[in-house]
Amino acid sequence: MLNVLCVNWGLKFKPVYTQNLYNMVKRHLTVPHKFICYTNHIKLQKIVKGDNIEIRKLPFAEEYQGYWNKLSLFSPEAKLSGPCLYFDLDVVILDNIDCFATFGNNETFGVMRDFGQPQMYYNSSILRFNNSNAP
């Protein structure tokens, strides 16, 4: 099953951003999936509502500042196994995203190109990776 991931850490995004992302994914992804939000918000579990959603504490987040805390998702302590599709909380999904779920094979790492300079830079707002070899 596909793991759809997000990180809601610190004060930048209110819990409603997690709810909105969950709702967009549910509306535009037909592939079987589980939605997992890594957070430090104690009450997020009570605020965000939906089927097949998990709220987890993000490992090692204190070691990374700002958007770099998403690197914790690659740690064995994140307890992820199988295909993963990550979205930043400010991503807007307007149409079907099944192509992201089926992109590549089990060894493929996917990252989007930067809109401003697509020939030079990448943007980690959307990531596709596989943790099949995770413990």
Predicted features along the sequence, with ranges:
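N-terminal anchoring/stem segment of glycosyltransferases
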Residues: 1-62, 79-80, 131
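Short, surface-exposed beta-edge/turn micro-motifs
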Residues: 2, 33, 107, 123-124
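Surface-exposed flexible segments
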Residues: 16-19, 121-125
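GT-A fold catalytic core of metal-dependent nucleotide-sugar glycosyltransferases
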Residues: 43, 50-62, 68-121, 128-129
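Short, conserved charged micro-motifs
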Residues: 134-135
